[in-house]
Structure formats: C-alpha cells, structure tokens
C-alpha cells in the first residue's frame, strides 16, 4: 500500500499513512485535516470495517434508509468520505478537527492477524492515540468518537489510560464482553459468528483486487496483496468457535471488557432504547460505574447508526468535544448529566435528568399469578405451577389496562421460581405493549423494526448472583460457575431486564412473555439488511439458536411456581409526573 497526499474537497487528505506498532507491524491510516497549517484536536477511530469502504457501498440498505428519512445526514457533504459508524470528515474538518481512521490489524489496508477486542488490538489502539497526539498537526488533545465497534473499544482503550486521550464519545457501545455481547444471561448469542462472516471476512487484508474497490477513487479497499484462501484463514481467528469455547466468564472475556476504576477520562455515553441484545447495557453501566468525574449519559431511539449522523447527534458531539479538545468555554458544563429522548408510541420527547437510574423513580412490583395476570397484589396463596415446553413459545402474563398515562423509564428486574424436567433451562423474557384494541405496539429498534419495549435472558444454571454488584433493579450474575438443576427442584431466579423508556397511553396494557426461545413479532413482515444473514422479526441479528449451546438439556419442560412464599414479580421503574 502506497502512502500519498492530496488536497481535495476543502481538506488535506493523507492516504494510507503507516503507523508502526511495538512489534514492528505497520497499520495504515487515512487522515483528513484542515488545509491551513496549524495544530488541531484529533478525532481517531480504530476498527475492522475498512477505512476505504464507503458507507453507501458497503451498507447500501442502511444508507438508503437513513438518507431517505433523514436528509440532514447527507446535507452539506459530498458524502464521498462517509464510512460505516465513524464521523464524516466533511462535517468536522471545516470546524478545525483532524479525523484519523486506522484499519485494525488484519483488516482493510492493515496487515496482520485478526483477533477482535484482544489485548493486542487494545494496545495497538493506545499506540495510535499516542502517535496522533505528537504529530505536527496535532494540538496534543485526542478524542475518540464512533458507533458500535468504535464505541466498544473506547471503553477498552480508556482502561489503559493513554496520556493523549482527553475525551471520548461512546455512541452505542457495549462494555462487558460476556454480559452485553456474547452470552446474554449465560446464553450464547450467535450474532458475532455471523457478523464475522458478513462484515469482517469481506474486508480482510489480502483480498486485494478480489475484494471490493472504492467506488469513488478506484482503490482496492483491502490493500494490494492478494492472498490465497488458506493464507487468509491463517491470518484470522475463528471468532465464533473461540466465543463458544468460553461459556463462562473468564480471562478471555475480562481482557475484552472495561476496567471501570481505570476509566477516568471525560466521556459522553450515548445509548439506544432499541439496543437490546448488544449495546444499551454497556452505555448505562459505563455511566454508572466508570471512575470518570466528568461523564454524561444520553439515550435516544431509531436505528443504531442514525442519530450519530443527524444534526441532533453531531451538534451534541461537537459541543462536547469543543469543550474538552479545544478548550472552548461553551455551555457544555451546564449540560445536565442525563439527556433522555423519552419514548412515546408516536415519537420522542427530550428531557433532562441529573442521575441514572432516575432518583424519583417509584419502583413498583407487578406480581404474576397462575391466572396469567400481572397486578399489584399477590393473588396466589396456595402453591401452584404452570408448565410449558422449554424451547417453545412459553406463557404470557397480562396487566390490567392502565387507567392513566404512565411512564416507565429505567432498568427492570424479574423474580421467578422455576423448575425443569432436565438439568437446565433457558428463559427469554419479553416486555410487550398492547393497545386498547389488543394490537401489539412495536418500535424501530437499533436494527429491527419489530422491537418490543424490553428484553432479558437467564440460563438457570447461571442464576448465582454477585451480591456486591447486584441491585434490586439490576441483578448482576457472576457467570463464573454452573449450578445445574436437579429435575423438579424449584430454584429462585433473578433476571436482569435491560433498560427501557415508554409512556403508556391510558387504556393500553403490558404483557410479560416468558419463553424458551427468541421473541418473534407475530405481525412481522420479513425484512433484511444487507449486512445481516437473518430476517428481522423482532430480535434483529441478536439470536440464541446455536444447536451446540442449546442442546437436549434445554429441550424438556419448564415450570413456573406460585404461592405466598413464592410470589414472582416484575419490578417496574414508574416515573411520577412532574
């Protein structure tokens, strides 16, 4: 790969700049900076999606949907330099920022072995940050701003405390490799194996002209080298197999997760109510647990990538970075610590809070009974049970219609008393909203257009709690050992349900579905995005259908138990009207 520079579209662009790592390997970066000589703050990203692959070329269905619905995304830019889940330099360089995009080891223009989220990747990223901080065009203040992968690795690299890292914006970025990303409640997510096939192998370094060619400049996206399929395979991990080989939370997961007491840099953590199954939990946990004294939380809706690129998102990001990277005395320090786009059935309303979870929350228990109801009272005084197929559709508990508009915003928890005919059981928990006409109300999630209001998961053998980290509103499971069931034995299970926000109209009601498999919206009309294998039916690509992980042990009968001493309940965060 040859480095060269040009002045184009009102920017000085340095293509394929080498950055040498401590082991001698050279990563490649594209650098977009102001034409006027000077020193500027730097926004850097490091990731696998190929810096030379235009957003609209690599992800056409996501791009077309976003561009059509949100014209402010494309306005004011040629869009030739748009790249998946990182900033558009044409919207940042004119405001005095340098934008640096680094292809991670083994991807795009960078050679090497692909090992996602490993300590090697994290240390590469740290070295790139320190490199950017001392370049002639840098003022020494480096920030990170990106979505998803480019958010996840912010938590990781900040845990290593690079000296030039002065601020970061984690836009929809998970933080716990086990709990957020690979094993929901101990149940294997098949997302990463499919993601690896669709979004990484397609841009692996060494594809050369056999790979994609940038539609705007005609350059090979994956470098000039052309390796055989055997050589390509040697140069990458077997990602899905590696994840499956680590079913418990151990060093493999811990080195790919945030170290909260080491994260001290100012940050803005931006989550998505529809980010069930990947990112939302990481954004809220980061805000609660990171050691940083200057930290803010924002939660929005719509697709995973949309608000990052809209005027709403870009303006928020610029206010934050202008203060911390440029030293501008703007109004950022007056920004309330929490900014929520509170979700209604027909849109969102912005509201500020001072903390998360919201301090004025009325934590409300809704008890389930054997009449398939949810209410504020314990109705079962005698022992009883309901049994369902352990991999089936499960059972539904219905609340009474709400007699007034009611807001639920925050994390949730579910207590159950469970037995199985086998040694284990997987529980999939779905909180759903229905209209006064008995029609289910679903939302555009981070990926899926049929997303319910909240979900949670737990494998019975993973029910052990970390007592130090658990809270009534967020059970925290250790996942370091298995406690298998004796068939017929009744055990207590506390299930974490990821945060949500919904203002429930008068006359609408909630339904709690407890299932043995992933949720599917009954009214879903099959849809796909170009970068995912599966149809979108309610859970997006975040499925739990691996036949090795969910073998015959999970295919028996599951029973829920009721009684005065076994009163299952859903803990709801009801927000009083102000």
Show where each model-derived region lies.
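N-terminal cap/lid segment of alpha/beta-hydrolase-fold proteins
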Residues: 2-38, 42, 398, 402-404, ...
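Glycine/threonine-rich phosphate-binding loop and adjacent beta-strand/alpha-helix elements that clamp
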Residues: 4, 76, 313-315, 325-578
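Accessory cap/linker subdomain of secreted extracellular hydrolases
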Residues: 52-56, 60-78, 82-89, 94, ...
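Alpha/beta-hydrolase active-site loop
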Residues: 83-84, 94, 116-136
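Conserved alpha/beta-hydrolase
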Residues: 89, 93-109
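Alpha/beta-hydrolase fold nucleophile elbow
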Residues: 136-149
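Short glycine-enriched nucleophile-adjacent loop
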Residues: 151-162, 416
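Short beta-strand/loop motif that positions the catalytic acidic residue
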Residues: 269-271
């Amino acid at each position: 790969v040859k480095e060269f520079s040009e002045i184009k579209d009102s920017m000085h662009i340095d293509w394929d700049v080498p950055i040498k790592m401590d082991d001698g390997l050279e990563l490649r970066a594209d650098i977009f900076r102001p034409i006027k000589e000077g020193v500027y703050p730097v926004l850097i990203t490091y990731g696998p999606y190929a810096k030379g692959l235009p957003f609209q070329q690599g992800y056409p269905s996501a791009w077309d949907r976003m561009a059509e619905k949100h014209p402010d995304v494309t306005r004011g830019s040629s869009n030739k330099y748009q790249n998946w889940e990182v900033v558009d330099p044409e919207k940042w360089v004119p405001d005095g920022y340098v934008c640096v995009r680094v292809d991670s080891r083994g991807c795009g223009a960078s050679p090497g072995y692909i090992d996602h989220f490993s300590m090697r990747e994290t240390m590469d990223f740290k070295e790139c940050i320190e490199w950017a901080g001392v370049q002639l065009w840098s003022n020494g203040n480096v920030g990170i701003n990106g979505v998803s992968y480019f958010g996840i690795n912010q938590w990781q690299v900040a845990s290593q405390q690079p000296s030039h890292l002065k601020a970061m914006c984690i836009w929809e970025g998970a933080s716990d490799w086990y709990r957020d990303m690979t094993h929901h409640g101990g149940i294997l997510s098949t997302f990463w194996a499919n993601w690896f096939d669709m979004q990484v192998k397609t841009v692996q370094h060494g594809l050369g002209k056999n790979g994609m060619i940038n539609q705007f400049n005609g350059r090979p996206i994956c470098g000039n080298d052309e390796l055989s399929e055997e050589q390509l395979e040697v140069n990458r991990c077997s990602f899905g197999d590696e994840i499956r080989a680590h079913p418990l939370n151990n060093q493999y997961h811990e080195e790919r997760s945030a170290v909260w007491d080491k994260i001290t840099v100012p940050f803005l953590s931006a989550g998505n109510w529809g980010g069930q199954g990947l990112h939302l939990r990481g954004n809220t946990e980061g805000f609660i647990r990171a050691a940083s004294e200057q930290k803010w939380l924002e939660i929005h809706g719509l697709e995973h990538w949309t608000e990052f690129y809209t005027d709403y998102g870009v303006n928020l990001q610029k206010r934050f970075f202008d203060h911390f990277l440029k030293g501008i005395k703007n109004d950022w320090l007056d920004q309330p610590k929490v900014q929520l786009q509170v979700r209604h059935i027909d849109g969102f309303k912005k509201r500020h809070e001072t903390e998360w979870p919201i301090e004025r929350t009325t934590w409300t228990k809704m008890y389930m009974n054997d009449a398939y109801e949810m209410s504020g009272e314990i109705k079962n005084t005698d022992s009883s049970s309901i049994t369902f197929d352990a991999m089936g559709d499960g059972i539904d508990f219905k609340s009474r219609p709400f007699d007034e508009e009611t807001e639920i915003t925050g994390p949730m928890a579910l207590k159950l008393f469970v037995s199985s005919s086998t040694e284990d059981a997987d529980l999939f928990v779905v909180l759903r909203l229905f209209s006064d006409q008995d029609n289910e109300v679903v939302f555009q999630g981070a990926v899926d257009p049929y997303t319910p209001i909240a979900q949670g998961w737990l494998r019975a053998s993973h029910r052990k709690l970390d007592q130090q980290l658990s809270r009534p509103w967020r059970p925290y499971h250790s996942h370091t050992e298995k406690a298998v069931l004796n068939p017929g034995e009744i055990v207590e299970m506390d299930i974490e349900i990821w945060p949500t926000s919904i203002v429930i109209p008068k006359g609408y009601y909630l339904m709690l579905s407890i299932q043995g498999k992933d949720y599917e919206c009954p009214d879903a009309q099959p849809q796909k995005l170009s970068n995912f294998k599966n149809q979108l039916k309610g859970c997006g690509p975040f499925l739990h259908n691996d036949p090795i992980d969910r073998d015959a042990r999970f295919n028996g009968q599951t029973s829920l138990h009721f009684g005065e001493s076994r009163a299952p309940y859903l803990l709801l965060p009801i927000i009083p009207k102000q």
